[in-house]
Amino acid sequence: MYKMQLLSCIALTLVLVANSAPITSSSTKETEQQMEQLLLDLQLLLNGVNNYENPQLSRMLTFKFYTPKKATEFTHLQCLAEELKNLEEVLGLPQSKNVHLTDTKELISNMNVTLLKLKGSETSYNCEYDDETATITEFLNKWITFCQSIFSTLT
């Protein structure tokens, strides 16, 4: 009788230990690669926006984006994911005129996939946004800084 309860207790303990185990090195390496890809995509977008040949930059700067009050953890990636649709719309404005932003849809799609891998499918995190909005360049710079910070803790 007690043997079955003891075995159940041991099984539950093993499940708890396995679920709370630290990330394996292969998972860490994969996370590093995903963060690096997200960082590169953000930098590519920023370079396209800041390109001196971008005739729509002044128009793009009128659009405002929300940024989290304090982005320091992976859960904050949900905030970036929520703003990607707006980012895609703003970047789509000059698409035919700016060679550097022609692959916007593909970049945003790649970022969505990468974000899903990094943050998982859970969307229960509610972002606390800063009271002040940011321009497109401020928005991209803030997320680039966030990715660099997270990436440095992983390496």
From Swiss-Prot:
The terms describing its cellular component in GO are:
extracellular space
Major localization listed first in the record, in broad terms: secreted
Give the subcellular location.
Secreted
The organism named in the record is Canis lupus familiaris
Q: Which InterPro entries does its entry note?
A: 4_helix_cytokine-like_core (IPR009079), IL-2 (IPR000779), IL-2_CS (IPR030477)
Top-level taxon of the source organism: Eukaryota
The record describes the protein's role as:
Cytokine produced by activated CD4-positive helper T-cells and to a lesser extend activated CD8-positive T-cells and natural killer (NK) cells that plays pivotal roles in the immune response and tolerance. Binds to a receptor complex composed of either the high-affinity trimeric IL-2R (IL2RA/CD25, IL2RB/CD122 and IL2RG/CD132) or the low-affinity dimeric IL-2R (IL2RB and IL2RG). Interaction with the receptor leads to oligomerization and conformation changes in the IL-2R subunits resulting in downstream signaling starting with phosphorylation of JAK1 and JAK3.
Q: Which residues form a coiled coil?
A: none
What protein am I looking at? Answer: Interleukin-2
Q: Which family does it belong to?
A: Belongs to the IL-2 family.
Q: Which GO molecular function entries does the Swiss-Prot or TrEMBL record give?
A: cytokine activity; growth factor activity; interleukin-2 receptor binding
Signal sequence annotation: 1-20
Taxonomic lineage: Eukaryota, Metazoa, Chordata, Craniata, Vertebrata
Q: SMART domains from the entry?
A: IL2 (SM00189)
Q: What are its GO biological-process terms?
A: activated T cell proliferation; adaptive immune response; cell surface receptor signaling pathway via STAT; extrinsic apoptotic signaling pathway in absence of ligand; interleukin-2-mediated signaling pathway; leukocyte activation involved in immune response; negative regulation of B cell apoptotic process; negative regulation of inflammatory response
A Pfam short name: IL2
